[in-house]
Amino acid sequence: MTPYEKNFKVPGRFEDHECTFITWPCKDSDLEIFNYENEIVIFAEKLSKFEKVVVIADPSNFDKAFKKCKNFALIWSIPTDFSWIRDNGPIFIKNDKAEVAGVHFKFNGWGNKFEKCES
């Protein structure tokens, strides 16, 4: 039986959710977001007043993320080289029985436009 047949759906972004994931800026990312660590800290801290925040940090950046965010967020050490969690993070689905599952998509870098994106 497929998730669809079990009435699983991707919830709307406006629906209640358990927490928010944020990726700590990555040095090797092709984006300049590495320059915005302080903004990520401010955002995560403010958001934590309303919901649980999980900061995902590459092991090479874990100590820095932990030091700056430990008082208001959970910090998870997970290998990553991309700062935009929306493009490479988990997608959760739920059904009317309140069951939650994760979906594993093979992210191809927007149609293999970028060599680095082969997850």
Can you name each region flagged by the protein language model?
Residues 1-119:
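The feature marks the mature, well-folded catalytic cores of soluble enzymes
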